[in-house]
């Protein structure tokens, strides 16, 4: 990758983050009256719904803390990180069991709790960045405590009817992959001592049960022993999810200087990019079938924003770690398609949901699932990766 291209991409990612995406959410997503963050926004940032997804109280707080700790000590970023943590402290925990809600109303009154504890994973990394920024020990302790709730609830969903009966028990890749990135974040922010053990356990689970070299696939849902169920749910692949998991594993390989982990992460990317790339219209398909049979999910051929964010990260990570030209080409391919179709030139930020041909399906900028996370994380990480590539190139010449 030549110097001019690196500098051009840094400008796209850095300026997109600091001058477009972050300002959009700072203008429209801060609830200065009731606290916390509002994410259900129309194309122009106007409010569509005042209910608050708890995932984004944690995710946006994490982003603001991450930027404060690692980009620039802007007081506004720290104050708004505190703003989000304060709302979570006051409204997002169920006092009956210590778990977090999934959805609250504008005032913070609970609406819904889910079986799986992903609100907790995002809150944990937010508390971690807050602790690092402020030096407040209670926040570091709370971050680890919430992480442990996340682990325990996902291993043993107390108080909830199991998702699957014993007729065909199954498990998804979501828990171990989110355990990896959450533990990595907390290792970095608060030096959490149990991080490596959970990362080891989670990577082992994924490579043993979900990673299938004989099929050249990463399976989303498997039996408890890694069996593949030849049914709709068992054959359904989620390329974006698997590619996101791939860069988590690459990142751990980089941290440990472990080439075997890097190799596994790159292999996951190769398989799932090949399966997920739409050869007719371009872009990453949301779901595909392991045997190339029809998929039951009616949104299977839509182009969501976040698989493209994760593939942009993963391909650039693979290029940094291997230097292989195919990953530079892969990154260029997905970057070009995404940046031609998702950005809104008039109002800023990205559309989230496109039809298969890349036309806009719905113009909103945020909802329960889309908010300030995948896109700004992609911009921030790719900015860093490109600076690392720049440095690597300079030392090799």
Label every PLM stretch briefly:
Residues 1-397:
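Glycan-recognition and catalytic cores of secretory/periplasmic carbohydrate-active enzymes
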């Amino acid at each position: 990758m030549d110097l001019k291209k690196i500098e051009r991409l840094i400008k796209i990612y850095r300026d997109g983050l600091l001058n477009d995406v972050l300002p959009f959410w700072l203008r429209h997503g801060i609830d200065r009256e009731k606290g916390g963050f509002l994410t259900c926004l129309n194309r122009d940032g106007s409010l569509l719904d005042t209910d608050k997804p708890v995932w984004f109280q944690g995710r946006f707080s994490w982003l603001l803390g991450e930027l404060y700790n690692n980009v620039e000590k802007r007081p506004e970023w720290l104050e708004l990180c505190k703003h989000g943590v304060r709302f979570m402290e006051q409204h997002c925990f169920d006092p009956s069991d210590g778990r977090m809600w999934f959805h609250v109303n504008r005032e913070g009154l609970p609406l819904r709790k889910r079986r799986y504890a992903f609100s907790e994973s995002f809150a944990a990394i937010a508390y971690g960045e807050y602790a690092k920024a402020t030096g407040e020990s209670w926040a570091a302790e709370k971050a680890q405590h919430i992480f442990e709730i996340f682990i325990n609830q996902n291993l043993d969903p107390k108080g909830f009817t199991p998702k699957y009966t014993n007729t065909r028990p199954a498990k998804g890749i979501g828990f171990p992959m989110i355990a990896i990135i959450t533990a990595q974040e907390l290792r970095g922010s608060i030096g959490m001592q149990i991080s490596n053990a959970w990362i080891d356990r989670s990577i082992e689970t994924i490579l043993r049960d979900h990673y299938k070299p004989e099929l050249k696939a990463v399976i989303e849902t498997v039996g408890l022993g890694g069996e593949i169920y030849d049914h709709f749910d068992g054959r359904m692949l989620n390329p974006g999810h698997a590619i996101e998991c791939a860069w988590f594993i690459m990142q751990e390989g980089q941290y440990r200087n472990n080439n075997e982990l890097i190799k596994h992460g790159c292999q996951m990317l190769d398989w799932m990019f090949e399966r997920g790339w739409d050869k007719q219209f371009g872009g990453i398909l949301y779901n595909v079938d392991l045997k190339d049979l029809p998929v039951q999910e009616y949104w299977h051929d839509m182009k969501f924003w976040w698989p493209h964010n994760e593939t942009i990260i993963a391909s650039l990570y693979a290029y940094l770690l291997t230097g292989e030209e195919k990953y530079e080409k892969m990154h260029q391919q997905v970057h070009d398609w995404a940046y031609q179709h998702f950005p809104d030139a008039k109002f800023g930020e990205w559309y989230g949901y496109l039809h298969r041909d890349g036309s806009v399906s719905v113009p909103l900028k945020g909802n329960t699932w889309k908010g300030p996370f995948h896109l700004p994380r992609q911009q921030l990480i790719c900015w860093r990766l490109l600076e690392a590539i720049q440095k690597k190139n300079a030392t090799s010449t």
